[in-house]
Amino acid sequence: MKEWIRAISRLGACKDAMEWAESYDSLPEAWAACERGDWMLWLLGRLSGEPGSEGRRKLVLTTCQCARLALPYVVEGEERPRKTIEVTEAWAKNEGGITLEDIQNAAEGAAYAAKGAASHAAAYVAYYSVLKECADIVRAHHDAPRN
């Protein structure tokens, strides 16, 4: 097993990601080819530092940009998901005195809205339709992590 793959294995990468990674000689090569934004965000999350750190805030902004890809799938008139993203972006930019607790409260409201708003099948389709776009967003804001 390649050293870079051993490193992501130690971080707890899922079996599917590990199998996919075997096709690549290096993390930068895999990073450039990856179409799974969720995997990329997961890896950055494992490496970006403690909650509240600058590295984490940059990652949160990237994640918010990815989350915005799902907004077209939100039921018309339902504002909680968009508001949650906006609160989270404000926190990441150190604007308005937003706390992690504020984000958690907003996210709970958005999750409650999502529970009744869409069928499981529609959510599944929406999720997979934006993974490649999310991967492109991640690459635009983050270089491949170092081995």
Model-identified regions with their sequence ranges:
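Short, glycine-biased loop/turn motifs at secondary-structure junctions and
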Residues: 1-147
